[in-house]
């Protein structure tokens, strides 16, 4: 399959991305909808989830991506490999996350990852960053106790801001105040491999959803 070419940066606040998506019937998507679910927000070409779904078939995987051609390409590859625990959806996470979380069976979402999100360096563009207080609150409300949120970036400013947003939500507890020395997941992303091959740092943090008082 030829590699799909897309723009690297997509403005999630543009008018074309302000239509709330329709979520599928999850019982029709996954062979076993009772498995724990890993949600990857901003999955790009989906190669990370493709490897995870193969390595950990006891989990279901859902990738959200705002660039629709990448979603179509990733789902085609998943179908070719007959992976019934993997699905990708075209979505603007800042708009669609709450409806998505409401659509899922209660308690199945056990892990969320946000990896190397678009940094949007210019100050006037920072409101386009995916991790906003509203996203954190939505996850805190939906995730069961013990669920994990894994964050990583090669941009210190972006990683620090993401961690600040999650640390400000009392229902999340960071596992370690220092950056994690290694990725706790068994599969690296394509971006992670590229950064490490250049011997550049990757900043990682893990948050756990705390039990209700």
From Swiss-Prot:
Q: Which UniProt keywords apply?
A: Methyltransferase, S-adenosyl-L-methionine, Transferase, tRNA processing
Q: Which domain of life is it from?
A: Bacteria
Positions contributing to S-adenosyl-L-methionine binding? 40, 65, 92, 118
One matching Pfam family, short form?
A: Methyltransf_4
Catalysed reactions listed for this entry:
guanosine(46) in tRNA + S-adenosyl-L-methionine = N(7)-methylguanosine(46) in tRNA + S-adenosyl-L-homocysteine
Q: Which enzyme class? A: transferase
| E.C. number | 2.1.1.33
Q: Which GO terms describe its molecular function?
A: tRNA (guanine(46)-N7)-methyltransferase activity
InterPro entries attached to this UniProt entry: SAM-dependent_MTases_sf, tRNA_(Gua-N-7)_MeTrfase_Trmb, tRNA_methyltr_TrmB_bact
Query: Which residues are substrate-binding?
Result: 122, 154
Which family does the similarity line name? Belongs to the class I-like SAM-binding methyltransferase superfamily. TrmB family.
Query: What role is this protein assigned?
Result: Catalyzes the formation of N(7)-methylguanine at position 46 (m7G46) in tRNA.
Protein name according to UniProt:
tRNA (guanine-N(7)-)-methyltransferase
According to its UniProt entry, this protein's organism is: Synechococcus elongatus (strain ATCC 33912 / PCC 7942 / FACHB-805)
